[in-house]
């Protein structure tokens, strides 16, 4: 079915699963908790292994429940295909390894989640020989100056976590494409409220663990392929030339515009094995069904909390994508048309010790290392999520010693504010 004629919410409820499962008529997507699938005959098995016919062989590389999730997120993003993997970190890693190898370079914005920064700064280089150059992405000129003949991709986060900066996607996409490389965007914190493919992105990655799942129950990642990038421009021979590990297949010739995502599945997922479990896929499918409703409430609550914090005597500063002091405010207003996200950061007067006292005084808000839960969450990034970074590296990613990060939930906003207020007051007590 052509899902492009349907609205976002209709696709979120129906795409990838129509008509209802033939054998039973199940309206809900069934959980196919199986490792493998019976072939009809020897010829059928041979065709599947030769990639001559779509179908399922082994759950490590494909599963009917997981496939529904992949088709649904591809429909929502209006891409040609998607791959579900075991975590957001796996999604980011595969997205890079699919097109880069030893000696290649990636140009990345510096406003990154701490786990991504560590992956790029240390693990990718030490294990794969891939060099990541970090630049201040708030000025597109920095991106262009960092690109060389060895560059294989430009990487951005939609809203830097926790710096909350928003890049000029269209300007950066133009630069990347002029140099013959794709733009990869991590849209984890902005599903529904930002559509990366509409603004020049070629590949989108998600930690589905966050807002897509929405309830803090499951770990998973997603890679979505726009199908618009020209992989035949001479910079990506692995997508064009025969793959000796898979019968000499040329991904571009065989899969056309879906070459990137097909290679990611048949090569990386097959060999590295970070597959998503069918049960987690089922939970993410449920999450997609209410994603837009939750994101609207997250954003609505966040705006009210920003206003509360701005006037609180125990707060020294507040940051949000459209805050007056945020240097990329105009980009947020330009690109984020359905809301400005659920992440709010602020400083508690009294610095690190006062911040610790604030965290320990919360009663309703949960202190934990996650974002995107339906419940409101709080953390002190400098001592937790970004602890492995040096103080200089923390500052480059937007983390200050006094920073508190809130992931605003969908509770009654008055209750969230009441908990913030009492904890802030206690943080100032001698």
UniProtKB/Swiss-Prot annotation:
GO terms for molecular function: cysteine synthase activity; O-acetylhomoserine sulfhydrylase activity; pyridoxal phosphate binding. The keyword Amino-acid biosynthesis applies. Pathway: Amino-acid biosynthesis; L-methionine biosynthesis via de novo pathway; L-homocysteine from O-acetyl-L-homoserine: step 1/1. Its cofactor is pyridoxal 5'-phosphate. InterPro entries: Cys/Met-Metab_PyrdxlP-dep_enz, Cys_met_metab_PP, OAc-hSer/O-AcSer_sulfhydrylase, PyrdxlP-dep_Trfase, PyrdxlP-dep_Trfase_major, PyrdxlP-dep_Trfase_small. The keyword Transferase applies. Keywords: Amino-acid biosynthesis, Methionine biosynthesis, Pyridoxal phosphate, Transferase. Pfam families: Cys_Met_Meta_PP (PF01053). It catalyses: O-acetyl-L-homoserine + hydrogen sulfide = L-homocysteine + acetate. Its EC number is 2.5.1.-. The modification N6-(pyridoxal phosphate)lysine is found at residue 210. GO terms for biological process: L-homocysteine biosynthetic process; transsulfuration. NCBIfam families: OAH_OAS_sulfhy (TIGR01326). PANTHER family: HOMOCYSTEINE/CYSTEINE SYNTHASE, HOMOCYSTEINE_CYSTEINE SYNTHASE. Catalyzes the production of homocysteine from O-acetylhomoserine (OAH) and hydrogen sulfide (H2S), a step in the methionine biosynthesis pathway. Is not able to form cystathionine from O-acetylhomoserine and L-cysteine. Belongs to the trans-sulfuration enzymes family. This is O-acetyl-L-homoserine sulfhydrylase. It comes from Thermotoga maritima (strain ATCC 43589 / DSM 3109 / JCM 10099 / NBRC 100826 / MSB8).
